C-alpha cells in the first residue's frame, strides 16, 4: 500500500474512532486516557479534553519504567492540577494497580455521578502503542472476558468485566495525532505512536539522539561508541556500526531504523523526552529547529 493510500486509510480510521467515542461517552462514567510516560504531552490524544467535555477522566502515564522517575513525578504534579493522574509500570510481572483504582474512585467522587461502590464503566483512550492493550491485560487479569454491549450503544466494542468491579472497553480505531508540529511529531515516532510513513524517520532519529546526548551524554558513547557528542549523529552511528553504502557512504536510513528500534526496546536507557516547562517540550537543537 502506497504512502498516500495508507494515509487515507488512517484518516478514515481516525474519523470513525472520533465518531465512535462521541457515541460511546454517554454510556461511560469515566475515561482512562493512556499516554507514554516518556512524552506525556506529545502522546496525549489532541482534542480529547474537548471531546470528553465534563466526563471524569484519569490520565495514565504508562511505561514509567522507561522514563526518568523525577521527571515523571513532576509531570504527575502538573497533571493532577486538572484531573487525577497516575504513572504505571505495566511491564513484566504483576503491576500495582492500586493507584489506578484510587484515582478512578477519586474521579467518580469528584463528578458526583456514581458512588465508587457501585458498578462503573470506563473507556480506554489513547494513541497507538501508548500501553492501552497492556493496561487492559493487567486490569482484566489477562482474561479479556467480554460481557456484552452496554444498553444505548447499539454497535461498537465489547465490554470487559474487571475483577476489581466495573467494566472497561478499549476504543478501536485510531485517535488523530498532532503531526503538524515537529517537536511533537518526532517524539511520537520515537515512542512508536505513529509510523515512519507519517514522519521522516531519519530526521526524527537525529532529533532523538540530540535529545539523549543532552540529557545522558555517555549513553551514545556506551551504546554506539561515538566519540563526538555533536551532530550529525546518524553518520557517526552508521560508521561505528559498519552500516555503509557503496563507496563507503553512511547508510543513514539503516542507522535511523536501528536507533529507533534500540530506543523502543529501552536500550538507550531511561530518558524522558519531555520535561514540564517550555511549550515544545525541548530545546531547539534537540527538536531539529
Please annotate each region the language model reported.
Residues 104-107, 142, 240-241, 263:
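Alpha-helix boundary/capping residues
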Residues 111-115, 137, 143-149, 215-219:
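Short, structured loop/turn "capping" segments at alpha-beta junctions
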Residues 122-141, 145-147, 171:
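Glycine-rich phosphate-binding P-loop
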Residues 1-31, 37-58, 64, 70, ...:
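Helix-rich effector regions associated with P-loop NTPase G domains
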